[in-house]
Regions:
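Bacterial signal peptide processing site
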Residues: 19-21
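...with weaker cross-activation on analogous glycine-rich loops/strands in unrelated enzymes
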Residues: 198, 358-426
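C-terminal motif of bacterial Sec signal peptides marking the signal peptidase cleavage site
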Residues: 15-17
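Active-site nucleophilic cysteine motif
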Residues: 323, 333-364
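Second-shell loop/turn segments in exported
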Residues: 192, 262-263, 305-310, 328-337, ...
Length: 488
């Protein structure tokens, strides 16, 4: 009997457990299996009557994309122009030796590089306009924007930072738009007056101060200043900055390639013109550095075919590749929707060659050797462009718009530019646009065949100058003009 009691006790101990290291038994529930409803092949919708399907919405789509013979006749591809007109660069240009000092300039600031009045120019400039509902904005809205701009705190933070995502740079600390007049061509969508520029992922910046509510910060990049969302930037210390600057630079040559970390998690999309610090070269990828939202320096991977180490000399292969990508772009006023306008297209095009250009059109037109078109007629302008212009190294400038000279084709001067539309004017004087809305290669007579073409605004007739940005500047008398983004 004693033996059986001992055995029973032993079994109880074994089954129930008595040691301190044993864990309680956990019974795992079998997860429920959820499946979506089955689709039924039928012409009868199962949606309730109060839901309007997209195809049932009755709207009249404006027919503004008229036929433009330039874009049909001339190749909308880089190969013909590169093969005919481009040369492989033999020696480094002086401008290419100064890329680093321009690119990293924001990290050298100890305080804001301009005064508060200059930074806050927009407060007095914008006191009326239309909002997202196309209704006039009340004066109280502008007063609130002035209050939120908090320029009493200008240059109070004085911190070096970096962009952790692609950002829209705004004139006011708000994502809401401001239109001059939605009823007039060129004064409504997409020309949001508050879209100042954009900031690339991992781009160096300097933080001046925060908005009154703290949701926005006023920053300086190497090419612009304005408001960005505070949660899109992080502050860096001196050790981090020096660590990033010491690395070789990786120049991105592809758009919209997913960049992932070592765990294959998405970090950002690639963008032509983006620069990343290089860590290592692997079999298929470049390993580069980025800063995450906690301010920690981490690694991501870039496919080898989407970047190159250091800036390259201007060459036909690279021109072909970059230009082909950029010709796919739709028009993006001030970088809206992560697209490009005229000046950002040219700026990004030349960045992989280690050439730094300013952001706005008027400033770009002052880089390098400037040749004025004052007192020249159209025939003389064409002759001068053919004589002096260097394909892919020359900018043609009219007020508010820049075009990259890509040489001649069938004896015509050809330009690559990202353009919103062709100006029109009917017999009653009503102005309009034939929407192009993308990057194109055209002559300087683009749109001359369009109905009601406004000949007074033809590209060739309105050209003011040309500048070879790879050549050293020469002193000339030039009228100062405040730069504006293009809305051609």
């Amino acid at each position: 009997m004693i033996f059986f009691r001992y055995v029973a006790f032993t079994l109880i101990v074994i089954l129930s457990g008595c040691g301190t290291k044993n864990s309680p038994v956990v019974i795992k529930a079998v997860p429920a299996v959820h499946v979506p409803p089955m689709c039924i092949e039928s012409n009868v919708t199962t949606f309730s009557d109060d839901i309007t399907l997209a195809q049932e919405i009755e709207i009249e789509i404006p027919q503004k994309a008229a036929k433009v013979s330039d874009l049909d006749h001339y190749p909308q591809a880089m190969a013909p122009y590169v093969n005919l007109n481009a040369n492989n660069q033999a020696n480094l240009y002086e401008i290419q030796k100064h890329f680093d000092e321009n690119y990293y300039r924001p990290w050298t600031y100890q305080a804001a590089p301009i005064c508060a009045k200059e930074a806050g120019w927009y407060i007095s400039a914008f006191r009326a306009g239309f909002g997202s509902n196309l209704r006039p904005l009340p004066l109280s809205w502008f007063s609130e924007m002035e209050k939120q701009s908090n320029f009493q705190a200008f240059s109070s933070l004085n911190q070096s930072g970096i962009a952790i995502k692609y950002m829209n740079m705004r004139v006011f600390p708000t994502a809401n738009p401001l239109y001059k007049n939605p009823q007039k061509a060129g004064d409504g969508y997409p020309f949001d007056l508050l879209q100042n520029s954009s900031v690339a992922f991992n781009e160096p910046l300097f933080i001046s101060h925060a908005s009154l509510d703290g949701a926005w910060v006023y920053i300086f990049t190497n090419s612009a200043s304005g408001w960005v969302e505070a949660n899109s930037v992080v502050v860096l210390n001196n050790e981090q900055i020096e660590s990033l600057k010491r690395k070789e630079k990786l120049f991105i040559t592809d758009d919209k390639i997913p960049l992932r970390d070592r765990d294959k998690r998405f970090v950002a999309y690639s963008r032509i013109g983006m620069v990343l610090p290089l860590v290592e070269v692997t079999n298929d990828n470049y390993k580069a550095l980025y800063v995450d939202n906690s301010g920690t320096i981490k690694e991501l991977f870039v496919p080898k075919e989407s970047a190159h180490i250091g800036s390259s000399l201007i060459n036909k292969d690279e021109l072909m590749k970059l230009g082909s990508h950029l010709l796919r772009n739709t028009y993006g006023w001030g970088g809206m929707f992560e697209e490009r306008d005229c000046s950002s297209m040219i700026r990004d095009f030349v960045t992989p060659f280690g050439i730094w250009l300013p952001r706005n059109s008027a400033q770009q037109a002052k880089k390098g050797e400037v040749i004025s078109f004052n007192d020249l007629n159209n025939t003389q302008k064409i002759a001068l462009i053919k004589e002096k212009g260097i394909p892919f190294e020359t900018i043609l400038y009219k007020k508010g718009h820049v075009l990259l000279y890509v040489g001649t084709y069938e004896n015509s001067v050809m330009v690559m530019h990202n353009i919103w539309g062709i100006r029109t004017k009917d017999k009653e004087g009503l102005k309009g646009r034939v929407i192009v809305g993308r990057a194109v290669i055209s002559t300087l007579e683009l749109g001359a065949d369009v109905e009601n073409f406004d000949a007074s605004n033809m590209l060739l007739s309105t050209l003011l100058s040309m500048n070879i940005f790879t050549k050293a500047p020469i002193p000339i008398a030039q009228k100062k003009e405040k730069g504006k983004l293009s809305k051609i």
